[in-house]
Amino acid sequence: MDTKQTDKQATFGADIRANLRMLKEALPAEDILVYEFTAGDGIACAAVYADGITDKELLGALVARPLAAAPAPKTREEVRRKLLFPEVKEADDLDAAGKEILAGNPALLVDGVRGALILGTKKVSLRAVAEPQTAIAIKGPREGFIEDIKTNMGLIRRRLKTPALRFIMLNVGKYSQTAVAIAYLDGVADKKAIRAIEARIRAADIDGVPDSSYIARFLARRPLSLFKQAGTTEKPDILCAKMLEGRIAVLADGSPIALTLPYMLTEDFQSAQDYFVSPYRATVSRILRLFAVCVSVFLPALYVAAQLFRLRLIPFGLLIIVSGGIRSIPLSPGLEMFFLLAVLEILVEASVRMPKYVALALSVIGALVLGDTAVKAGLVSSPAIIIVAIAGISAYTVPDLTGTLSLVRILYVVVAGSIGPYGIVLLTALLIWYLVSAESYGVPLLAPFAPLIRHDLADSLYKADLAALDRRPRALRGKNRTRLKLRRDAAAGREDEQPSGEGPDGQAADAAGEEKDA
C-alpha cells in the first residue's frame, strides 16, 4: 500500500460500510476482494483479502461458518473467541490493516464492532525443503533453505532449541514490504554488531527487496569493494554452526540465501565436509584450496611477465616448448592472455545461463573445438590455453570467491603485461594493504592472521582436533566464549579440570586464554 496516498492516522469505527469504503479507497487494486456474510442475528460481516495469496476455503470454514452459527458479537474479544482460527491479530488503523491484507492476511470487519481482526489465512505455494544445488554435500545434512522466511526460521529453530535464539523482524522495501529477520544467539553474539546491523537495515530506503543480496548492499561498509563483506549460505546446518561461533544471520523472505556477519576471509576456505573428516585431511584440503587460489590469480600473470621481461626465469626445457608455441602468434603475450581470459569468462557466463543439456555441449565445444582450432590457426599458443584452463579450474575450488578471483586475475595480467614482475609485486602489496585494513563490524577481514590471534588459528587454514576448539573465536568479540567442556575419565567417575574454566560462562578460562593469546 502506498503510504503517501493514505492517511496513516485513519482508524476504523464501528460502521462496517464506512470501514469498507476506507479500505477500498486505500486499496483500489482489482485483486483486492471483499467476502461479505452475516453473523448471528443478521449482523453484517466482511473479510477483505488479496486474491491468489489468501486461502479462501480456510476463510469460509474457520471464520464465516462459526460466526454465522453464533449469536451476534459485540466486541472484538467476542469475535476472537468464536473463531476457530488460532492466528488472529488486532488492527485499529487503516495502514496496519492494509499492509496485512497485501501480505495475504485478510482483515475481518464486523458491523457494530470497532477495529479489524487480522486472520492468518495466508496461502503460500512452496517448494519442498531439498539439498541446494550450489552446496552438494557428500556427508552431513542435506537440507537447504527455501524461499519462505517462516520455514527457514523453523529450520534454524529445530537445530537451536534454546530460548537464547532470538529473531528481530523487520519490513524492508517501500512497495515490497519484504520480511527480514535478524537471527542471533543472545549472550553469544556481539551486541554492538547486532545493533549496527539492525540500524543499517532499518535505514535502508529501497522500493523492493527481491533477494537477500539487496540487503547485503546496505550492510556493506565498503560498497565498491572487490571482496564481499558478508558470508552466504543456503544450508541451515552451516548457518547454525556459524551462529554458535557468535555470528549474526540475516534472512529475507523470498530468498533461500542467508547472510552471516561479521565476515572473515578464511570462511571461504572452509567447507562443511571438513568437520566430517579427520583434522589432517581437513587441513590438507584447506591448504590445497589456498594453493589453488594462488595458482588461479598468479599463474597467468607470471607467464606473461616471464615472457616479456624475464624469459630466463623459465626452465630451459620448458622454454623450448613455450618458444616453439609462441613463435608465430600475432598477439603479444599480454593481449593473448587477456583475450583467452575474456573467452573463458564468456564460456562460463553462457554455460551458467543455458539449460543443462545445452551447457554441457557448450562446454565441450568451448574446451575442445575452439581451443584446438585457435591453436591450429595460430591465433593463440597451446601453453597459454593450458595456463588459462588451470587458472579457471583452480578458481572453482573456492566457489564463493570465483567472481572476485576472475577480476583480480585480469588485474594481475594487465599490470604484468605493462610493467612486468614489479607490477605483480606492487599489486600484491596493495591488495595485502587493502585486506589488512578492511573489517566487518569490528572484525578484521584477515583475522586470525592479521592481527595474529593464536587460539583462532585452530580453525582457520589449520583444522585442529575438537578438543582444541573449546572456546569461540576471539575475533568475533562475544562475551561468552566457552563452547565446549570435555569430561575425561567418566568411567571412573572422576572429572578432570575443565579447560574452559569454572562457572557457567567459563570466565576464568577466558581471561587466562586471552592473556595467553596476547
Regions found by a protein language model. Give the residues of each.
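Generic detector of multi-pass transmembrane helix bundles and their immediately adjacent loops
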Residues: L302, P315-G501, D505, K516-A518
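Membrane-embedded alpha-helical signal segments
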Residues: M1-L302, R312, F316, V436-A518
